[in-house]
Each structure stands twice: as C-alpha cells, then as structure tokens.
Regions:
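Low-complexity, acidic/polar, glycine-enriched regions of mature
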Residues: 20-207
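Positively charged n-region of N-terminal signal peptides that target proteins for export
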Residues: 1-4
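Bacterial N-terminal signal peptides
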Residues: 6-16
C-alpha cells in the first residue's frame, strides 16, 4: 500500500474538542508539496543526505479514521512503503553505496508500520511518541519516534526525527580506500510533513 497515515492527524485529534466524545473520527488529509523524507549519514571524510519527495510515496489526498483509547492514538491505515530507488542525492557515490548496503534490487521497498502513538498532554510542540516498526532488507525493528507539530488554521506541519544504528538490521557500514574512508553506523531518519487536515463533514462543505 502506497499510503502513509501514521502521524498526520495527531495535532488535530488532540485539539478538536468533539473528539473526546467520539470513539472514532473520520478525516480528510491533503498532503502538500514540501513534504519530504530524508536520511542523513556521515563518514570520517564527508556528510551525505538522501532525499525523497513526499509525492513519491504518499497519496496527495487521503481519507482516514482515527480512534483514541487509553491515551493512545490508533489509525485505520498505518502502513508506509518507501521505494528505495526513489531517493536522490548530490553525492552519487554515497547513493550507490546506500543501494548496495540495503540491497535495493532484492529489497526495493522499505516498510514502516505504525503501531500506535502515545499522546502527551501538549496539543502542539512535542505532542507524543510514535511506536513504529521499521523493516529494511527483511529485518524488522521497533523504535520510538518523537513527534513535533505546529498548527496554523487547518494547516499542520509534522517533524519526526530519529537516529538509528544500521547494525540493528544486520548491515555493515561501507569501508573504502583500504579503510581510509569509513561510513558511520548511525543514520538519522527525518520525515517532514505539511498538510491540510479537516473533518470529513467540513471538507465536504467546502468542496
């Protein structure tokens, strides 16, 4: 499924008063062009960055249902598939090494699945922690991703960032030039999302 639902609605759900009286809440999410997934890394010589525009792995318009139980947020759609070969970088050598490292021919897609979000008491800023399963080269690991958000009317921005160790996925950092160039085992995954979020009934009124 080329659908990303995992974090987009947290701010709205914690700030809409009627949600407290509902078991579920239907929403319309319009994803903006600035949305981006970035993987950052470094070696002992140079830093590198891989970018993938949101349009490559997220539908522009999504209809979702969210529910809140015991202070946790659950979503009806919770899977994200990231095509590995859609990443771009100005460092072509690093990008080739990345494809080789994650075996992009054998495993062309990275999988991210949201279990749930533990909501904080803050409607904005640090709004909670997302428990997410990340699958790379067929190996799945669970991480806690902190979620930050800002709101301006129906426009929301979400900033989700986490440093992980590639050895968690049984991957070995590349080494070049007889050991003179070594890639660090830590990478930082950063998902930035900008979107408009409205309850379905309000969205239908302004169509």
């Amino acid at each position: 499924m080329n659908r990303f639902i995992s974090i987009l609605t947290i701010c709205l759900l914690t700030s809409v008063g009627t949600f407290a009286q509902l078991n579920s809440y239907p929403l319309v999410v319009d994803v903006m062009e600035k949305s981006m997934l970035t993987i950052q890394g470094k070696s002992n010589v140079v830093d590198f960055k891989f970018d993938q525009p949101g349009e490559k792995f997220i539908k522009k318009k999504m209809y979702i249902t969210a529910s809140r139980r015991d202070g946790n947020l659950y979503l009806s759609e919770k899977n994200l598939e990231i095509p590995v070969k859609n990443f771009m970088s100005s460092n072509k050598m690093a990008l080739r090494d990345f494809h080789k490292l994650v075996k992009s021919d054998e495993y062309p897609v990275m999988h991210i699945e949201l279990d749930h979000v533990r909501l904080s008491d803050e409607p904005l800023g640090d709004i909670g922690d997302a428990l997410i399963d990340v699958t790379i080269t067929g190996v799945t690991r669970r991480y806690t991703f902190p979620v930050k958000a800002e709101k301006n009317g129906s426009n929301f921005t979400f900033d989700i960032k986490k440093s992980i160790n590639i050895r968690d996925f049984n991957l070995t950092p590349p080494v070049h030039m007889m050991g003179m160039l070594k890639v660090d085992e830590w990478i930082t995954i950063n998902l930035f999302m900008e979107c408009d979020i409205l309850p379905v009934d309000q969205a239908e009124l302004i169509r």
